[in-house]
Amino acid sequence: MANSGLWELITIGSAVRNVAKSYLKAEASSITAKQLYDASKITSSKRSTSDLHVQLLEKYRNGKVKHASQIKELGLSSKDTKRTLLGNSLDVQKDASGVKHLQEQSSKEIKNPISQPILPNKKDEISPAKPSAIDSSIKDVTKSHPATNANFTADFESSIEESYSTENKSPVILSSSKVPSSQWSRLWHYGGLATSLSVGAIGEKMKRMWGISKDDGALLLNERNVEILVNKLTQMRGAALKMGQMLSFQDSKLIDPRVSQILERVRDGAHSMPEKQLEQVMVKNLGKNWMTHYSEFDRKPMAAASIGQVHRARLASNHMEVVVKVQYPGVMSSIDSDLNNLAYLLKASRILPKGLFLENSLAAARKELKWECDYEREAAFAERFGSLLKNDSDFKVPMVFREASGPSVITLEYLHGIALGKQKYSQATRNHIGYLLTKQCLREISEYHFMQTDPNWSNFLYNGKTKKIELLDFGASIEYDEKFIKKYCRLLLAAAHRNREKCKKLSVELGYLNNHESAQMIDAHINSIFTLAEPFAFDAPDVYDFGDQTITARVKQQIPVMLDLRLQPPPEETYSLHRRLSGHFLLCAKLGAKVRCKELFSGMLKHYAD
């Protein structure tokens, strides 16, 4: 049966199921305008009907309800309490209060698991700790891959800045749900999602006709559908959630605000898998006696992201504190089908702007996702970085424990540093950190020819005792062709010397331009490169103040022109390379670092000069 036929079958089946559920929930037999509107409310699970449930959940997640006595004061039974606390956002929302709560919840940030201390447990198991943010190794919140680029610097977009919050916020309570692991089950979920969104759009249209809704936005992106889409993507995990996280780093001005809202929330949330599935993954990778590798293992994850979750543990062999990344079952095998189904939804909805080259973005995402799902590949890159920085006085890379790792499980050394932005530093320390990060970024491009391309700054810890920067998450590491790197470095040098003709020539050789673009497009492209190279320019100040930089804002001004006028997508390398570069600039800006960029740049790239 053709894929389109499967979509039709699943869509029809889901429509019958959802409409029937809505019809049975009607409280009166007569059909009124309000009931027609209610019939379009499709939910993935039962909703709480009590204001007390909403009140309890909000208080619980804010840390105000901790004991049974407090719960009883709210007048709820233990059954009600369990249902309320374990329910997801849709379960307890009222049209207004639920949206408000979800928005508050999506903005929360939690500590990096690799920087959390491990506490021994009398029962030979690590005591459950408050959930903390996934180390950047799986923060795929963390992983922040833009799916598309406007042109040379289309990754410099405002939403990246929003992911680098420096506030210490309350921990998020992870919801647990089974990961749909087979292709058929995932296809069924996508079909149900498509139907729910369609019925929701019809319902929204009827509400507007009857004057019930004052919303004037896109029908498909009504408030109800936003909740459905966020809930489904966080439940599905895998490529669906990953793609949402990638798209979340596109400029919010170029995408419908409600799409941006959806993407921001799926970037910051995911469900953890039940313990039964955790056991299955561990057995598959390390054997039935997998627990013999650990003297302690916390079965409750510290955090969950798009392709896996993180657990704290201690090795049995040497009692070292470690973190264990466990991949969701079926994520690797479902990448192709997930992205195909997601592309179907994106094309059908027409919610993405012209110029994003969806097919190219999906192709890049497909390749990178498969790399990131290969934990053995990640282990190899971690060891490679570790070897290069083994004797470095400024950087540390976690050890990989191969005996406790597999294709979808990786055990890494626990690091004691704190994620950048989690604490305040003196100006001198911020300058030092900015200098080291700039040096490492340029070193990866010009010397290593491979980079860790995840821009999330939770991947960079600072250890106040050792004064070292600790590097995490090598799943997004990519090696670049030497010919590409040579021309790319020459392009950066030309931009630093403000040579427009040479920039244009090298841009054509690299594939950013094809000599048929309009003068307006060429100017926008070259101006964006000049802006990118500003900290390294020959006429730049010796010490560049990132705290005052406006690079991001000025490059953003060129993006609409490039999206509208470009004739071809940028080189494939751009998607990952500029993700790292843009992330580095924003990281230094958040630190407010003052760095001798020009000196570093000229010294490290001088052998690429003509």
Swiss-Prot record:
Highest taxon, organism lineage: Eukaryota
Enzyme Commission number(s) of this protein: 2.7.-.-
One Gene Ontology term of the molecular function aspect: kinase activity
Keywords: ATP-binding, Chaperone, Kinase, Mitochondrion, Nucleotide-binding, Transferase, Transit peptide
Pathway terms, separated by semicolons: Cofactor biosynthesis; ubiquinone biosynthesis
Compartments in which it is found: Mitochondrion
InterPro entries: ABC1_dom, ADCK3_dom, Atypical_kinase_ADCK, Kinase-like_dom_sf
Biased composition (Basic and acidic residues): 98-111
Region (Disordered): 98-144
Pfam families recorded: ABC1
GO terms for cellular component: extrinsic component of mitochondrial inner membrane; mitochondrion
A GO biological process held by the record: ubiquinone biosynthetic process
Enzyme class: transferase
Similarity annotation: Belongs to the protein kinase superfamily. ADCK protein kinase family.
Stated role: Atypical kinase involved in the biosynthesis of coenzyme Q, also named ubiquinone, an essential lipid-soluble electron transporter for aerobic cellular respiration. Its substrate specificity is still unclear: may act as a protein kinase that mediates phosphorylation of coq3. According to other reports, acts as a small molecule kinase, possibly a lipid kinase that phosphorylates a prenyl lipid in the ubiquinone biosynthesis pathway, as suggested by its ability to bind coenzyme Q lipid intermediates.
PANTHER family: COENZYME Q8, PTHR43851
Protein name, UniProt field: Atypical kinase COQ8, mitochondrial
